Amino acid sequence: MTPTNIEAIFDRSLPQSPDAERCVLGSLLLTAFLGVNVLTRVSSIITPDDFAQDSNRAVFEAILELDADGIMADLVVVKQRLRDKGLIDRFGGGAYVSGLV
């Protein structure tokens, strides 16, 4: 491969899958509901910038913030955090977050 072809590979945008993003978030919310915290492992692989959809990025950031505060990020707590930040109505309200699980 010539250098130009290699550069072209890295200039392409990554594939996006809103469904996969929602599945990751739903899994995090469900495991928190069960009292299991898998966020440490997930956050070593996925960052907020990996989410193409702003709504999903906001939910993931809320989960990370809650975890940093020592709070288990279940569905109810995440919705409240987004409400407190004035973000929940930007992407469909609590119904959107509830729909992740």
What are these model-predicted stretches?
Residues 1-101:
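Noncatalytic partner-interaction/assembly domains of nucleic-acid and motor enzyme complexes
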